[in-house]
Amino acid sequence: FFAEVFKLDKKMLDESKVTIEPESAMYSFGEKGALLPEGAIRSFDKVAAYFDKKAFANLKSDASLEKKAIDWVASLELNDDKKAGFAVTAIYNHLRKVRDWHNEHPYTTIPEGINPLTGKPLSKLDREMIADSAMPKEVHERLMKDLHRVLTEEQIEQILDKYTVGKVAFTLKGYQAIVPNMTEEETTFVLEQLKLAREQAIDYKNMKQISAIFEIYKTKCEQYFNEHGRNWRQMFKDYVNKRQEEKKAQGKK
């Protein structure tokens, strides 16, 4: 190649003089920076100390949210890159808005007070939930509108499951283990409530908040059982006792 390009005399070529150097030889200061002067900056994280820490944290967070959106959409294995890109952007924008609202409206913006149902002081989580629940509904509506534009109902459910780490299936499985011979009607009601919880929960930033939303709908499920001939407290007690007996039996083996 070089002989052709530079018009070299091929008779003078001597391949014995050709050496192949490892890539690491190109690193002037060693492969891992071993030859760098003492005190030299070795990572971008150290450079960040000289910049706006809040802005740097947001940049890192943005990158993390973007990766999350990309990974979630990639799991759908869409054949249309344009639709996939649109879905990624919709999810990324929603995740950012949820994060920004949460960070800009801390629990301290909610006055201390009592829970009117229990009479107990509002917890930090209670106040976080109140603050975050005030996020404009348009944020949620925009996400769902955009997802419906490019995804099927089944694909949207898969994305919502990503937001809530599969809590619908996990919680339903728990009810099926606790409630003896759970009927089709009961299963339909429980699944309906859990899906409502899932869609509401995507507008909250962390797992404690997501779990708190699911607790609201789990309470409705348990009230449903009590109102339709079941005794939730007794069923749960029986389930716990059964599990304890099973563990004892396994321990004796």
Predicted features by range, described:
Residues 53-253:
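Charge-rich (acidic/polar
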Residues 1-57:
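Alpha/beta-hydrolase-fold serine-hydrolase catalytic core, especially in secreted/extracellular enzymes
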